[in-house]
């Protein structure tokens, strides 16, 4: 290479280096200004000292995340700041008055967090905002009309009985049983039959096991990514081991939901089937989506349809499985309340061969115990919002637009200022006529964006608890105490292990 050519190449390299340095300095300045803005915005909300780079991440290690969280609840009234890392912070909220103010507004889901779910569940009802969310919610609400929910009780009972029959065989060999796995298969079986018109059994289908495992992987990977500044960039994440694992798990989940959609489409294309569906007064969840796609194609794309199915396939089974598993654990840990529930159910159902819609409102003490377990172990431990405009709370403190609020349902339910002796299992808190703040108990979130399927979930929990208590006596396995982990859904790191005894 000639001397002039070398000089030219050297000059280009210097220019590129200077541009790279300039971009690096601009990014550093941007991050510095972002941190200064956050420090000023959060000055009314104290917190433990945080590191300028990794924030409070060392405080919230996976094994002990709940303990520092509950210490904050006791030390800092109503809310406090939490730094994920140097340039990302949020305000943890665990006061019912604060919750009420936030949920009365139509604030969007925090995009910096919820966008990480898009490769998995797409932009369905959970992630949509604004007018699009309102239209989709209005379209899907009829799928949870009580006329639709009534016959679901029989389907729920059949799925529960399949699970209990399996348990009976297993405990004949070993009374110790991990329940989260089989409960998840049972709730998946239920949602597929009720909301997706599925004719098979997810509890005997091998593909369902791979779907359940994929969901567990996706939840864990989401939690890991939300806590890592390095993994926020999409390109870096896709190239990382976690990103590749996330892609594989999402593909398995999508294959499962695609099969469900295609199977129902094929059923609707049979002669006369579409006309029969149109004549129904109330349609189930998937039929609403498919008819909207077939008859009003522009209003719902194939991508939209799959996103809703992915969302409800996950939410419709996993949160309910968490709730049922923790309820059974709570009753196993408190045999006196378990026996009182059993006696109530025996008086109502007798031999337990059938349970109907009308029975569900006739088990008040069991319902009290279910609600108290949901207080202690809320299936969705928190939701996040991003302020679209400034907000002022009842105590006079305020926050500007752009701040992320983490509405910590778990912390709210364990707040001693809201619930005296919060770690005690006390079903009388939910006795008829007992008074409490309207936003003190939020297992299904609150406001206009509360869980659309909350009645479905409560019905399924009642059916599962009632039929289980009629057939088994439950006790905790003292050698395997659950380790509670608050991810997308509250779960135990080491499963939930019980000892079961078949009742005569």
Curated annotation (Swiss-Prot):
<keyword id="KW-0503">Monooxygenase</keyword>
<dbReference type="InterPro" id="IPR050196">
    <property type="entry name" value="Cytochrome_P450_Monoox"/>
</dbReference>
<comment type="similarity">
    <text>Belongs to the cytochrome P450 family.</text>
</comment>
<keyword id="KW-0560">Oxidoreductase</keyword>
<comment type="function">
    <text>Catalyzes the omega- and (omega-1)-hydroxylation of various fatty acids such as laurate and palmitate. Has no activity toward taurochenodeoxycholic acid.</text>
</comment>
<dbReference type="InterPro" id="IPR002401">
    <property type="entry name" value="Cyt_P450_E_grp-I"/>
</dbReference>
<dbReference type="GO" id="GO:0102033">
    <property type="term" value="F:long-chain fatty acid omega-hydroxylase activity"/>
</dbReference>
<dbReference type="GO" id="GO:0005506">
    <property type="term" value="F:iron ion binding"/>
</dbReference>
<keyword id="KW-0479">Metal-binding</keyword>
<feature type="transmembrane region" description="Helical">
    <location>
        <begin position="110"/>
        <end position="130"/>
    </location>
</feature>
<dbReference type="GO" id="GO:0006629">
    <property type="term" value="P:lipid metabolic process"/>
</dbReference>
<feature type="transmembrane region" description="Helical">
    <location>
        <begin position="6"/>
        <end position="26"/>
    </location>
</feature>
<keyword id="KW-0472">Membrane</keyword>
<dbReference type="GO" id="GO:0005789">
    <property type="term" value="C:endoplasmic reticulum membrane"/>
</dbReference>
<dbReference type="InterPro" id="IPR036396">
    <property type="entry name" value="Cyt_P450_sf"/>
</dbReference>
<keyword id="KW-0408">Iron</keyword>
<protein>
    <recommendedName>
        <fullName>Cytochrome P450 4A25</fullName>
        <ecNumber>1.14.14.80</ecNumber>
    </recommendedName>
</protein>
<dbReference type="InterPro" id="IPR001128">
    <property type="entry name" value="Cyt_P450"/>
</dbReference>
<dbReference type="GO" id="GO:0020037">
    <property type="term" value="F:heme binding"/>
</dbReference>
<feature type="binding site" description="axial binding residue">
    <location>
        <position position="451"/>
    </location>
    <ligand>
        <name>heme</name>
    </ligand>
</feature>
<keyword id="KW-0349">Heme</keyword>
<keyword id="KW-1133">Transmembrane helix</keyword>
<dbReference type="Pfam" id="PF00067">
    <property type="entry name" value="p450"/>
</dbReference>
<keyword id="KW-0521">NADP</keyword>
<keyword id="KW-0256">Endoplasmic reticulum</keyword>
<dbReference type="InterPro" id="IPR017972">
    <property type="entry name" value="Cyt_P450_CS"/>
</dbReference>
<keyword id="KW-0812">Transmembrane</keyword>
């Amino acid at each position: 290479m000639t001397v002039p050519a070398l000089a030219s190449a050297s000059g280009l390299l210097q220019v590129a280096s200077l541009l790279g340095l300039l971009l690096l300095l601009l990014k550093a300045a941007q991050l510095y200004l972002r941190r200064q803005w956050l420090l000023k915005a959060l000055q009314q909300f104290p917190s433990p000292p945080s590191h300028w780079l990794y924030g409070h991440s060392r405080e919230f290690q996976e094994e002990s995340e709940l303990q520092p969280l509950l210490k904050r609840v006791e030390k800092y009234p109503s809310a406090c700041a939490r730094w994920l890392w140097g340039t990302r912070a949020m305000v943890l909220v665990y006061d019912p008055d604060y919750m009420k103010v936030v949920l009365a507004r139509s604030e969007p889901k925090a995009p910096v967090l919820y966008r990480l779910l898009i490769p998995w569940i797409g932009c369905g009802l959970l992630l949509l905002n604004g007018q699009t969310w309102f239209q989709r919610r209005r379209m899907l609400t009829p799928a949870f009309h009580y006329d639709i929910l009534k016959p679901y009780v029989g389907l729920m009972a059949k799925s529960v009985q399949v699970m209990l029959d399996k348990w009976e065989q297993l405990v004949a060999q070993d009374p110790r049983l991990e329940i989260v796995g089989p409960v998840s298969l049972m709730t998946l079986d239920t949602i597929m039959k009720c909301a997706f018109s599925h004719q098979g059994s997810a509890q005997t289908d091998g593909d369902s096991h791979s779907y359940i495992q994929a969901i567990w992987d996706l939840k864990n990977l989401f939690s890991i990514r939300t806590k890592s500044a390095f993994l926020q960039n999409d390109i870096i994440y896709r190239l990382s081991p976690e990103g590749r694992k996330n892609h594989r798990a999402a593909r398995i989940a999508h294959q499962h939901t695609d099969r469900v959609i295609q199977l129902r489409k094929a059923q609707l294309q049979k002669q006369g089937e579409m006309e029969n569906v149109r004549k129904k007064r109330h349609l189930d969840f998937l039929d609403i989506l498919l008819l909207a796609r077939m008859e009003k194609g522009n209003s719902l794309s194939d991508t939209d349809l799959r996103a809703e199915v992915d969302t409800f396939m996950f939410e419709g089974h996993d949160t309910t499985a968490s709730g049922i598993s923790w309820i059974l654990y709570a009753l196993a840990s408190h045999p006196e309340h378990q026996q009182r529930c059993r006696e109530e159910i025996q008086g109502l159902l007798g031999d337990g061969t059938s349970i109907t819609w009308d029975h569900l409102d006739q088990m008040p003490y069991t319902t009290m115990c279910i609600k108290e377990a949901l207080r202690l172990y809320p299936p969705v431990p928190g939701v996040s919002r991003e302020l679209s405009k400034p907000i002022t709370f009842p105590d006079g403190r305020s926050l500007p637009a752009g701040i992320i609020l983490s509405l910590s349902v778990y912390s709210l339910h364990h707040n001693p200022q809201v619930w005296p002796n919060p770690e005690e299992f006390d079903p009388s808190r939910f006795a008829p006529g007992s008074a409490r703040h309207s936003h003190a108990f939020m297992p299904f979130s609150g406001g206009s964006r509360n869980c659309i399927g909350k009645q479905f979930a409560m019905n399924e929990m009642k059916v599962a608890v009632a039929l289980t208590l009629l057939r088994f006596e439950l006790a905790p396995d003292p050698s395997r105490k659950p380790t509670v982990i608050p991810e997308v859904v509250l779960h135990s790191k080491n499963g939930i292990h019980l000892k079961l005894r078949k009742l005569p």
